[in-house]
Amino acid sequence: MSSNPFIGLRNWIRGAQQWYLTTPKRALQEAYEAALKIRAIELEHFDGQPISPLNLPVGEVSSYFETELKQLLKTIRMRMMEFRASRQILPLAPFQSPPTPVNEGINGATETYTVTATVSSTTAEPSVYEKLRVIDATLNRYKRQREKELDALARPSLSRQDPQQRQQAAALDKIAEDSLYLSEYISDDLTSDSKLDSSSFIPRSILRTADRFRRELNSDEATEAEVVRDFRTSKLRTRLAVRFMLLLVILPLLTQQISKALIVSPLVNHFKAVGQIERIINSQLEDNILDELARFENKIRFESLVSNVPIAPEEIQNRIREKAIELSTEYQKELIEPLKNILSDALGFTVFLALVFTGQRQLAIVKTFLDEVVYGLSDSAKAFMIILFTDVFVGFHSPHGWEVLVNNTLEHFGFPRNEDFINMFIATFPVMLDTVFKYWIFRYLNQISPSAVATYKNMNE
C-alpha cells in the first residue's frame, strides 16, 4: 500500500512523457480535423464554395459563420506552428507514398482538395501526406479568397460604376474564380484606374444614371442579388477601412509612447554624455534656465524688500541654491529629452511604414472608402470643405498656425528657434500646398463634379 503514491507518480510521469512525445501527431490531427470541419460547413451550407462574408445573409447567421471560420483557421495555424516546432526535436511516423492526384493543372488542385477532404474523412487513418495536403489546400484556398474579397472591396460601389466598369469588374470576378493563383491572372490593364477614367462622348454620369434606372426597373432576381451583394460589400468596406485607419493612427502612437517609457528612456538615462551634444546644438536651454533662476532671485529679493520682516541674506541664498539645484535637474532632463523623442518617433514611424507596406490592399480599400465619402457629398458640402481646408492651411491667418507648428516641432527634436528658417518655411510651403489644391481642383474635381467647382468659385468670391 505504501508504494501506491510512487506508482501513481510514475504513471503520471509516463502519461506526461507519452503526451509530450505525441505532440507532433496530436497537433497535426487537430489541424486536420479543423480543416475537415471547414470543408463540412462549406458542403452543407455553401454548396462547396468558400465561406465569405459577401455571400452570407445579414444578421446573426453571418456573425456565427464568420466567428466559426476565424476560430477554425486560427486553430489550424496555431496547431501547425506547434507541429513545425515540435518536429524539430521529436520524431514522427514516416511519410507514406503520396496518393495520385485526381487531376493536374490549375483546376486540378481544387478537385484534388475536394476529393481528398471527402475521402479522407471516411478512411480509418489518413497518411501524414494526406493530412498536410488537406490543411495546405484549406489555408491556400482562404488566402486566395481573402485576396479576392479585398480586391472586390477596393472597387467602387454600383452607384459609382458605369456599364464599362461593371463589365470589367465582372471579368475580374470570373478570372478570380477560375484561377488557382489570383495574382498570375489579373492583368494590370484591367485593374488600372486610368483605363476606367478614359473620356467618352457621353458623360459617364449620364451612363451611370441610365444604368441605375435600368437596374431599378429590372425585376430579375439576379439584379436584386447584385444590389444586396453591393450593400454587403459597402458595409464590409466601411468596417475594414475604419479599422485600418484607426490602426494607422493608434498603433504608431502607442508604439511611440510605450517604447519611450519602457525602452528608450531607461537606455538613454544610462548615457549622460549624450546631453553634451544637445548643450552644443541648443544653447537656448541654458539661457532659459538662467533667466528663470534670475527671475526667482529677483522675486525673493522683492518679497524681502516689501515684507515687514526682511528675509535674512542666508535664507535668500539657501532658497536660491535649492532652486538652482532643482533647475539643474530639469536642465539635465531637457538635454536628453530630444534624443528620446527622436528614437521613439523613429520606432513609431517604422511601425507606420510597416503597416503601409504590408497593407497595400487595405490602403486600396481605404482609398475607395474615402472616394465614396468625398464624392458622395453634395456640391455645397464639397465647396464648403474645400474652402475650410484651404483657409485653415493656406489662408490669410494660416502663417500664425504654421509658426506655432514649426516652433513646436523644432523644440520637440531639440533644435533652437530659428526665425529665418521659420519665415522661409512659411513663405514657401503654404504656397506649394495652395498650388497642389488648385491643381487637384482643375485636374480631378473639375472633371468629376463641375457643379462643385462652380459652387466653390461662387462661394469663394
From Swiss-Prot:
It is found in: Cell inner membrane. The chain crosses the membrane at residues 244-264, 339-359, 386-406, 421-441. The keyword Membrane applies. Signal peptide: none annotated. GO terms for cellular component: plasma membrane. The keyword Cell membrane applies. Keywords: Cell inner membrane, Cell membrane, Hydrogen ion transport, Ion transport, Membrane, Transmembrane, Transmembrane helix, Transport. GO terms for molecular function: proton transmembrane transporter activity. It is a multi-pass membrane protein. It holds the Pfam family CemA. Required for H(+) efflux immediately after light irradiation to form a rapid H(+) concentration gradient across the thylakoid membranes. Together with PxcL, contributes to transient H(+) uptake following dark to light transition. Belongs to the CemA family. This is Proton extrusion protein PxcA. It comes from Thermosynechococcus vestitus (strain NIES-2133 / IAM M-273 / BP-1). The gene is pxcA.
